[in-house]
């Protein structure tokens, strides 16, 4: 079953498997309920629904009736909803609700986004270098760092195969996009595949996964502090590429890393060579243009890009006002793990970074092209029901998410070493260090 689910999503299974949990729902004596919720829920009242896409997009949908539609919950039912309970629908139900054209990949459209973003990157650099004005440099740094992040998202689509159906085109475009911003394409692609295949699993997830309590408490106090004290976590990505997360070993650059299978060594070496070539080019440009000019044109925008990447990816898996579950063992399944992800609204940035905020459907079906994710999300909402958490509307810039980030950094430190359904816990001593 696990192999069929992963192949349906465009994945090649990894050597290690976790059996998918078989669930069923007992009928509730009250006809208004679909299932029996637990007596002691781990979360409080869910956030009221916000119009995430309604103010920015007006989709005219022609959507087939989903196989499973949840009834509008009463107040009592909403209060008792357990996000860790197995859902009353399966992956096929969600897939059936998504229009068929959402699965179609258009390489010309994908390339048009590449041309657009690359043109903007060079245009911004040319304007900044021409005026060379300290009043304009901060605006350039933010804009160019955001565009570097947009390039990363397009390379990310290449890694998933949602860019096109041609693996060679995906590889060439992915290497050009990611190498230009010092990301090893295949090394990251493979580890990101592991992240999607194991999303929501305490031990086997790859990105921003929780630390078990025993590992957390064995960290040095300075490591704990830097891991959860802003802005340091938002600068972590380059260090993660070199040495991964606490509790895991290996490097995205080394072909013998635990991240990779033996047959993937050639791919990793190719990407590391491309990364090295880009680093050498930057060194040469330092001699030609001067280190200060290169710092202004490339160095600072690079770190803005890193902050965007860490900010977005962290909040797609953390920071909801209600605690969301993480799984182990038989309680984990591909569907349940994917339902712990979160959509976010980024205001004006939505279009710039290719609607990466539509993260739930992307995690469940990563081969859907980014330009179909908004429509696919709207179509899937009736099936997902309360397992979909409407994001709060953003202003022009997603400043509202800063509060969610700060709160999560203060509360989400580790999970229990035992239990197959666990929730983040806070370290009161760490919080005490900040007060």
Swiss-Prot record:
Subcellular location: Plastid, Chloroplast membrane
Residue window of motif Histidine box-3: 359-363
Entry EC number(s): 1.14.19.35
Membrane topology: Multi-pass membrane protein
Family matches, as CDD domains: Delta12-FADS-like (cd03507)
Aminoacyl-tRNA synthetase recorded as keyword: no
Any single biological process term in GO: unsaturated fatty acid biosynthetic process
UniProt key word RNA-binding: no
GO MF entries: omega-3 fatty acid desaturase activity; sn-2 acyl-lipid omega-3 desaturase (ferredoxin) activity
Main subcellular location of this protein, as a coarse class: plastid
UniProt similarity note: Belongs to the fatty acid desaturase type 1 family.
Protein name: Temperature-sensitive sn-2 acyl-lipid omega-3 desaturase (ferredoxin), chloroplastic
Species: Arabidopsis thaliana
Taxonomic placement: Eukaryota, Viridiplantae, Streptophyta, Embryophyta, Tracheophyta
Gene giving rise to this polypeptide: FAD8
């Amino acid at each position: 079953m696990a192999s069929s689910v992963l192949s349906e999503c465009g994945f090649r299974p990894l050597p290690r498997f976790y059996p998918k949990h078989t669930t069923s729902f007992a009928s509730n004596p009250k006809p208004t309920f679909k299932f029996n919720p637990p007596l002691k829920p781990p979360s409080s009242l869910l956030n009221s629904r916000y119009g995430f896409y309604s103010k920015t997009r007006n989709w005219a949908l022609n959507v087939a009736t989903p196989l499973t539609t949840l009834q509008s919950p009463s107040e009592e039912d909403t209060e008792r909803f357990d996000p860790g309970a197995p859902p009353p629908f399966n992956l096929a139900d969600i897939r059936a609700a998504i229009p068929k054209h959402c699965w179609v990949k258009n390489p010309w459209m994908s390339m048009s986004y590449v041309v657009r973003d690359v043109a903007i990157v060079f245009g911004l650099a040319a304007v900044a270098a021409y005026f060379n004005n300290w009043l304009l440099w901060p605006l350039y740094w933010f804009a160019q760092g955001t565009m570097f992040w947009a390039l990363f998202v397009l390379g990310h689509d290449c890694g998933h195969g949602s860019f096109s159906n041609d693996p060679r085109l995906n590889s060439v475009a992915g290497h050009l996009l990611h190498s230009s911003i010092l990301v090893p394409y295949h090394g990251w692609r493979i580890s990101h595949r592991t992240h999607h295949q194991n999303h929501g699993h305490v031990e086997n997830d790859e990105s921003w996964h929780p630390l078990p309590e025993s590992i957390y408490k064995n960290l040095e106090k300075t490591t704990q502090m830097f891991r959860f004290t802003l802005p340091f976590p938002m600068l972590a990505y380059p260090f993660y590429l070199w040495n991964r997360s606490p509790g895991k070993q290996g490097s995205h650059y080394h072909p013998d890393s635990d991240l990779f299978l033996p047959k993937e060594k050639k791919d990793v070496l190719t990407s590391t060579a491309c990364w090295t070539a880009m680093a050498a080019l930057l060194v040469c440009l330092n001699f030609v243009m001067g280190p200060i000019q290169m710092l202004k044109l490339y160095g600072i925008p690079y770190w803005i890009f890193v902050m965007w990447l860490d900010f977005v990816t962290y909040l797609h898996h953390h920071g909801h006002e209600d605690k969301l579950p993480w799984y182990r063992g038989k309680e984990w399944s591909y569907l349940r793990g994917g339902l712990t992800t979160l959509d976010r609204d980024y205001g004006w940035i939505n279009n710039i970074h290719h609607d990466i905020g539509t993260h739930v459907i992307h995690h469940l079906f990563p081969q859907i092209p980014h330009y179909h994710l908004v429509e696919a999300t709207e179509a899937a909402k009736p099936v997902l029901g309360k397992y979909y958490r409407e994001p709060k509307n953003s202003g022009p810039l997603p400043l509202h998410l800063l509060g969610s980030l700060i709160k999560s950094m203060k509360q989400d430190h580790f999970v229990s070493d035992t239990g197959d359904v666990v929730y983040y816990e806070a370290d009161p001593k760490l919080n005490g260090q900040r007060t």
